[in-house]
């Protein structure tokens, strides 16, 4: 469906549709009649998240190979500032001993930032190319506005939380943490298990949904501006919102990184 023939409601709905693959038939899903099934894959979210992850690796590897001890270039300086900032954050917040945390925090911060940054592209640019040049029925370009991506990343963090908890405290110590806190008496084990279980499970859920909610709302505002206002007046709201959104993009990447460090630091504490 060409965007110029859409009503505002159809335009907004079209831009909120993902390019989906039905894993049962390996055929593209019709965005106008999507099946209510678990067995669908959001191809666009997967594609852009992988591409941006590879871009991160290529950029940082290139800078690492060309790094000089002399006066660095602007790009090398920017990368060094990011690395120094993340390293300082990990040093301040993580009190355990692990060589994995700093690279993990750096990866999360830059990767989430790049995914968020896609929200600043013109809302119709890549969807127009995908529809008119590639014949794709729908395309969304902001991976972090897809709850499947954010919850998948949060699930990875959750697995690391469990790993470090068991590694540092042992299975017995981890079990005691779940069953003997906050009430240190065997009679309260069921209550403790419920309280600690909810607290533990809420970490990845809140981590993923916070990022998704903020980025989805930001994307939706851009779509509303483009879909409801005439083209000649869109810049009046688009430019201020884009400038403000730069802060949101950076802040959400920072929050995701910080909470990951804090959760892993809590998991690594020995009691």
UniProtKB/Swiss-Prot annotation:
<keyword id="KW-1133">Transmembrane helix</keyword>
<dbReference type="InterPro" id="IPR045082">
    <property type="entry name" value="ATP_syn_F0_a_bact/chloroplast"/>
</dbReference>
<dbReference type="GO" id="GO:0045259">
    <property type="term" value="C:proton-transporting ATP synthase complex"/>
</dbReference>
<feature type="transmembrane region" description="Helical">
    <location>
        <begin position="38"/>
        <end position="58"/>
    </location>
</feature>
<comment type="function">
    <text>Key component of the proton channel; it plays a direct role in the translocation of protons across the membrane.</text>
</comment>
<keyword id="KW-0138">CF(0)</keyword>
<feature type="transmembrane region" description="Helical">
    <location>
        <begin position="220"/>
        <end position="240"/>
    </location>
</feature>
<keyword id="KW-0472">Membrane</keyword>
<feature type="transmembrane region" description="Helical">
    <location>
        <begin position="100"/>
        <end position="120"/>
    </location>
</feature>
<keyword id="KW-0406">Ion transport</keyword>
<dbReference type="InterPro" id="IPR000568">
    <property type="entry name" value="ATP_synth_F0_asu"/>
</dbReference>
<comment type="similarity">
    <text>Belongs to the ATPase A chain family.</text>
</comment>
<keyword id="KW-0812">Transmembrane</keyword>
<protein>
    <recommendedName>
        <fullName>ATP synthase subunit a</fullName>
    </recommendedName>
</protein>
<comment type="subunit">
    <text>F-type ATPases have 2 components, CF(1) - the catalytic core - and CF(0) - the membrane proton channel. CF(1) has five subunits: alpha(3), beta(3), gamma(1), delta(1), epsilon(1). CF(0) has three main subunits: a(1), b(2) and c(9-12). The alpha and beta chains form an alternating ring which encloses part of the gamma chain. CF(1) is attached to CF(0) by a central stalk formed by the gamma and epsilon chains, while a peripheral stalk is formed by the delta and b chains.</text>
</comment>
<dbReference type="InterPro" id="IPR035908">
    <property type="entry name" value="F0_ATP_A_sf"/>
</dbReference>
<dbReference type="Pfam" id="PF00119">
    <property type="entry name" value="ATP-synt_A"/>
</dbReference>
<dbReference type="GO" id="GO:0042777">
    <property type="term" value="P:proton motive force-driven plasma membrane ATP synthesis"/>
</dbReference>
<feature type="transmembrane region" description="Helical">
    <location>
        <begin position="242"/>
        <end position="262"/>
    </location>
</feature>
<keyword id="KW-0066">ATP synthesis</keyword>
<dbReference type="InterPro" id="IPR023011">
    <property type="entry name" value="ATP_synth_F0_asu_AS"/>
</dbReference>
<dbReference type="GO" id="GO:0005886">
    <property type="term" value="C:plasma membrane"/>
</dbReference>
<keyword id="KW-0997">Cell inner membrane</keyword>
<feature type="transmembrane region" description="Helical">
    <location>
        <begin position="146"/>
        <end position="166"/>
    </location>
</feature>
<dbReference type="GO" id="GO:0046933">
    <property type="term" value="F:proton-transporting ATP synthase activity, rotational mechanism"/>
</dbReference>
<keyword id="KW-0813">Transport</keyword>
<keyword id="KW-1003">Cell membrane</keyword>
<keyword id="KW-0375">Hydrogen ion transport</keyword>
């Amino acid at each position: 469906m060409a965007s110029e023939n859409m009503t505002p409601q159809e335009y907004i709905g079209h831009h909120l549709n993902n390019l989906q693959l039905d894993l049962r038939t390996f055929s593209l899903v019709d965005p106008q009649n999507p099946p209510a099934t678990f067995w669908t894959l959001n191809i666009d979210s997967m594609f852009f998240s992988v591409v941006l992850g590879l871009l991160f690796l290529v950029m940082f590897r290139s800078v690492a190979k060309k790094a000089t001890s002399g006066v660095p270039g602007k790009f090398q300086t920017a990368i060094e500032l990011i690395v120094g900032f993340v390293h300082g954050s990990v040093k301040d917040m993580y009190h355990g001993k692990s060589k994995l945390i700093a690279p993990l925090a750096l990866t999360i911060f830059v990767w989430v930032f790049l995914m968020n940054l896609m929200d600043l592209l013109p809302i119709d640019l890549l969807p127009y190319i995908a529809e008119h040049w590639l014949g794709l029925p729908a395309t969304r370009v902001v991976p972090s506005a897809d709850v499947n991506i954010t919850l998948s990343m949060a699930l990875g963090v959750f697995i690391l939380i469990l790993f470090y908890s068991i590694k540092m405290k042992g299975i017995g110590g981890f079990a005691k943490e779940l069953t003997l806190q906050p009430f240190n008496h065997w009679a309260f084990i069921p209550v403790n298990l419920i309280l600690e279980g909810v607290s533990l499970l809420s970490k990845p859920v809140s981590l993923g949904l916070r990022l998704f909610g903020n980025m989805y709302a930001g994307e939706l505002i851009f779509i509303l501006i483009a879909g409801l206002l005439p083209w000649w007046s869109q810049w009046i709201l688009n430019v201020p919102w884009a400038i403000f959104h730069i802060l949101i993009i950076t802040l959400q990447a920072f929050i995701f990184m910080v909470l990951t460090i804090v959760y892993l630091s809590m998991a690594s504490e020995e009691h």
